[in-house]
Amino acid sequence: MGLFGVACTSACSEREEPQAAAPKAAAQPDAARPLATEHAGEDAGDGGPRADAPEAGPANVPSDPKGNDEDDGVPRVYAKTRFVWIWPNPSSEGQWIGFLWTGGSVRLRDPEPRFGPGCRHWYAVEPRGYVCVDGDRATLDRDDPGYRLARRFAAKLDSPWPHRYGESLGLRRYATPPTPEQQRLREPDLRAHLERVERARSGEVVEALLGVDLARATGTPIEIAGLPRSVHEPRNRIVPRSAVAFTDLEVFAHDRSWLLSADLMWMPKDRIVPYPTVTFRGVDLRKTATLPLAFFRGRDRPRYEKTPEGFVRKGVFARLSWVELSDRQERVGDDTYVQVRGSEDWLKTSEAAIPEPRATTPWGAAVGKPDDSGKTPEGRATWIEVSILGGWLLAYEGTEPVYATLISPGSGGLPLPGRDPLETAATPTGRFTINGKFATATMVAPRELIHGDVPWTQNFSGPYALHGAYWHDDFGQPKSGGCVNVSPIDGRWLFEFTEPKLPEGWHGVRWLPRLEPSTTLLLRR
């Protein structure tokens, strides 16, 4: 059931149930430490919070981001599986307007059920819509054993990283930790693989296992019971280079270590390369810095000093760091140099990503000035501007820029005339609207490549989405299959900033134009 139709391409691809887009294969993060004189991307700068303790976000933050504030005394619906649909009326006919997720819950608007097509017990939930409570997929009993198990491993939506993540080396998933015989039947290369594991544990460098955490788990297996089969994604085989999400639970069984996936399946730990935590974050322009500023993308970039002989290099600006800029510029041949604000350092504009705000808002008001256009949109008048070639993003509230960061567009750059952007992994240009928001979303591409539980996904056109990327930290550079990648920290900030708001307890929401405003997204060169 797609959100706005079904697509499955090598770029932005089919997402299970609600549609989104899949970026291309994972790239290993390569953290760079900044010099002391510029701001690190993983630190918000002068006194701002670090990435390991990020702020909740700009607005629209529920008291309990998981939607599991169960001690408030208000009756709730509790989700025991994925995609517990929320419908506009007590009927499964028509289009859903949102959904709950495994281990989540939402308050009831009315404790009395209603009968309607598709379900005997429809319950009205906050702030709108109806959920079918059948006891299997959803329950009113917070002490339901299946729900309590699901809640234990629910996505951590109060964190930019709802799960742990890694890259598949090619693996099989199991409903229970398998016996050695079951493993041999499902994994034809098991004997050779386990021999490589033992060699690597003995200290030999085994290239095929580089990055794999071979430490034996110490946990004890638990029974995954009391939940419907729909709690699991419909795949047992994960192809190499796919990105997978998993919980904190690691167990040892049948002489092997196992990880419990985000959808409560068991995966062999020795076939997964954990991703380093991506900690890059953008700049809050209301708290940390002001425009103009510059980011450094791709690699460390030269730092210049102005001398009587001209501009000479005197060090580097670290990759993914940023600086505020002064209004002092000098032209030398084809190069333009700008002085760093409050410093004797200079940078070359061609070696930095410098966000350049539009002169006007999408409705014609002057940016940076009071809005006297008389055309201000309803709601908070939020909009986002993205430069595909520049690799940057600016978020606005009304006429004011409020956030700046780096993004990774499609690896194909700009669309080619006469070619479908999906064919070239390009990011489309134009004006779009956020039409669906999903706290996590598994994305599926051709050849069964997946990116599991991609965080902070916001659809804006067909299979294209703005979303967090946990599999690389090369922001500012073209990386995706056409979607707009941001860091998980930036993804969560933007998810909470944009309209429509994700209601408390919901995991996904469809934009309903008749009820609420939506954030405009402008994608340009």
Range-by-range predicted roles:
Residues T9-R15:
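Bacterial signal peptide processing site
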Residues A56-V77, C119-R229, L259-D300, Q339-G379, ...:
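Boundary regions of SH3-family modules and the immediately adjacent low-complexity/disordered segments
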Residues D72-V74, T81-F83, R120-W122, R256, ...:
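Extracytoplasmic
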Residues N89-T102, L227-S242, K306-S321:
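SH3/SH3-like (including bacterial SH3b) beta-barrel domains
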Residues K314, S326-T429:
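Cell wall/extracellular polymer interaction/catalysis modules
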